[in-house]
From Swiss-Prot:
This is DNA primase. A zinc finger (CHC2-type) spans 37-61. Contains an N-terminal zinc-binding domain, a central core domain that contains the primase activity, and a C-terminal DnaB-binding domain. Belongs to the DnaG primase family. Keywords: DNA replication, DNA-binding, DNA-directed RNA polymerase, Magnesium, Metal-binding, Nucleotidyltransferase, Primosome, Transcription, Transferase, Zinc, Zinc-finger. It comes from Neisseria meningitidis serogroup A / serotype 4A (strain DSM 15465 / Z2491). SMART domains: DnaG_DnaB_bind, TOPRIM, ZnF_CHCC. The gene is dnaG. It is an enzyme of class 2 (transferase).
């Protein structure tokens, strides 16, 4: 976990205006900067960037956040990747676990080694791209595949010359440690030679565009057809996808991402205008791949050959996706005719028919899930139904998306003819409990007893986000029972007060990332942005804020006193409740 003080320092050294202006040309508009939103199509600028509060907001689509949030959303990076991206820009080293970064010399050495490896793969990619220009056989192969110079350049395709040590033309001495560590050169008991020879080369880039590895394809029928870089300090095939960096703009424009099996499929699809394709790197689609895909788009499509190998790969992808599923994301599976792969299909039928098949003939995960599991099972028999329950049970248990999990279990209930309550018991879950009126008196949530309070609480949260220094005016007694938005307000104030200095709004938002109150904070902050109430408050506003806090405290104390009095009349109070009531009554008098 990255320390919060590091995030604070990183944001303090980062100017969000510079970060966004590199991607979206900004124009000064009053105190803020404006542009057309990069996250949706629009003609009139509604995307605002605040240099003082260091956050962005789109008044049309609602996108908002700090510099970290922008990099995550715009480049499709995870939180740690976005932090690393910004840290590299300002020369900071992201702290690692287990005290790896305690020693400055160790940090510097590690950073130097990382840079050397990155420079090595970049130089190799340039070498391969240059070699392609001078090899007629390689150029003829790509020409036969119908690839234009623009697509070849966009994906950085190249050619690894035949021979044992072509990289000696670039790297001296040969070999060196970096060549071996990046997998470019094989060390076979002291004998060194290039891994990639006489192959079309596909550079593999990380989300920041840096070359981290390669895939190489033969020009003839030699084996292996594809050869990939091994896992290295730069490259992990289970956590990277080919074409993700090159296709990021097309993915955003289409609103979907397409997973295919081979590098050439990705490039061929791009040649025909389908630029949102990616491919796994010599491995099945992993859970990490699914996480990455879901960060890129709401709709994820898998397109595989219709043969047994393709269907096996599709099912592996589905299995690995189950724990990562979300109710606002959808997965679809398209199986092409056995004689086709995506490359040959789009060449034969064109972009329009390919996308029509993708959108209208692909099967949603829910349909493919039951189709695959039911294959070969006789559901007209009791034994078949029992088998389906048994085989689906461990898979259903992995699904954490609540709505989808519920609907899939409802579908299983229909398929096997078992009542949902009884089926839940078979699946190892408790059946839904009947509503029974509780005998024990429970203190009511303050939002129920005082419907005006959530609105007032939200106003205070909004004011605190805009003016973090006002947290000094919030002092909540320990004995108060807090829930809902009031608990959120208390946590927000405590977070700000624990900060060594008064944080900016963007820093506060990042501190709340991953907390139980993140959704509430974002909802209220978004409301403030939409209402354009984001200017800092003056002296009168600060006084009103303090009055509001006092009013909330009084309302909360009164509500809890009344609840305890009612319980005292009904069933009596225990010792802790008596002490609580005494504290509340004493506070009320003061």
């Amino acid at each position: 976990m990255i320390p919060s003080d590091f995030i604070d320092e990183l944001l303090a050294k980062t100017d969000i205006v510079d970060i966004i202006d590199e991607q979206v040309p900004l124009k000064k508009g009053g105190a803020n900067y404006m542009a057309c939103c990069p996250f949706h199509k629009e003609k009139t600028p509604s995307f605002s960037v605040s240099p003082t509060k260091q956050f962005y907001h789109c008044f049309s689509c609602g996108a908002h956040g700090s510099a970290i949030g922008f990099v995550m959303e715009h480049q499709g990076l995870s939180f740690p990747e976005a932090v690393q991206f910004l840290a590299d820009r300002v020369g900071m080293v992201v702290p690692k676990v287990h005290g790896q970064n305690d020693n400055p010399e160790v940090r510097a050495e590690r950073k130097k080694k990382q840079q050397t490896l990155e420079e090595t793969t970049a130089a190799a990619a340039d070498f391969y791209a240059q070699q392609l220009k001078f090899n007629p056989a390689a150029k003829a192969y790509l020409d036969k595949r119908g690839l234009s110079a623009e697509v070849i350049a966009h994906y950085g395709l190249g050619y690894a010359p035949d021979g044992w040590q072509p990289l000696t033309q670039v790297f001296q001495p040969y070999p060196n440690t970096a060549l071996v560590d990046t997998g470019m050169v094989i060390d076979n008991e002291g004998r060194h030679y290039d891994r990639f020879r006489h192959r079309i080369m596909f550079p593999i880039r990380n989300p920041r565009g840096q070359v981290i590895g390669f895939g190489g394809r033969v020009l003839d029928d030699s084996k292996p057809k594809y050869l990939n870089s091994p896992d290295t300090p730069l490259f992990d095939k289970g956590k990277n996808l080919y074409g993700l960096y090159e296709g990021r703009a097309a993915v955003k424009e289409a609103g979907r991402i397409l997973v295919v099996e081979g590098y050439m499929d990705v490039v061929a699809l791009a040649q025909f205008g389908v630029g949102y394709g990616v491919a796994a790197l010599g491995t099945a689609t992993t859970a990490e791949h699914v996480k990455i895909l879901m960060r890129q788009a709401d709709s994820i499509y898998f397109c595989f050959d219709g043969d047994s190998a393709g269907r096996k790969a599709a099912w592996r992808a589905l299995e690995n996706a189950l724990p990562q599923l979300k109710d606002d994301k959808s997965l679809h599976f398209l199986f092409l005719p056995e004689e086709h792969d995506p490359d040959s299909y789009i060449r034969a039928y064109g972009k329009a028919q390919f996308e029509d098949a993708l959108l209208n003939q692909s099967k949603p995960l829910s349909e493919y899930f039951w189709e695959h599991l039911s294959d070969g099972i006789h559901l007209n028999t009791q034994e078949g139904k029992a088998e389906l329950v048994k085989t689906s049970s461990p898979l259903l248990a992995q699904i954490t998306a609540p709505a989808l999990a519920y609907l899939l279990k409802q579908r299983l209930s229909e398929l096997v003819g078992i009542d949902p309550d009884n089926l839940a018991q078979l699946l190892g879950q408790e059946a839904p409990k009947r509503h029974v009126k509780q005998k024990n008196y429970k203190l009511p949530p303050i939002s129920v007893k005082q419907p005006v309070m959530p609105t007032l609480v939200q106003r205070q949260i909004r004011s605190l986000l805009i003016n973090p220094d006002w947290a000094a005016y919030i002092d909540l007694p320990d004995y108060l029972a807090l829930d809902g938005d009031f608990a959120c307000l208390a946590n927000l104030a405590e977070t700000i007060k624990n900060h060594p200095s008064v944080p900016a709004t963007a820093q506060v938002l990042e501190h709340m990332r991953g907390s139980p109150y993140e959704e509430t904070i974002n909802r209220i902050f978004r409301s403030a942005l939409q209402s354009e109430e984001m200017e800092g408050g003056g002296e009168e506003d600060c006084e009103n804020f303090q009055i509001g806090i006092k009013k909330l405290l009084n309302e909360l104390k009164y509500s809890q006193i009344e609840a305890l009095k009612q319980k005292s009349l009904q069933s009596g109070l225990n010792e802790s409740e008596k002490k609580l009531l005494l504290s509340l009554l004493t506070a009320k008098q003061n």
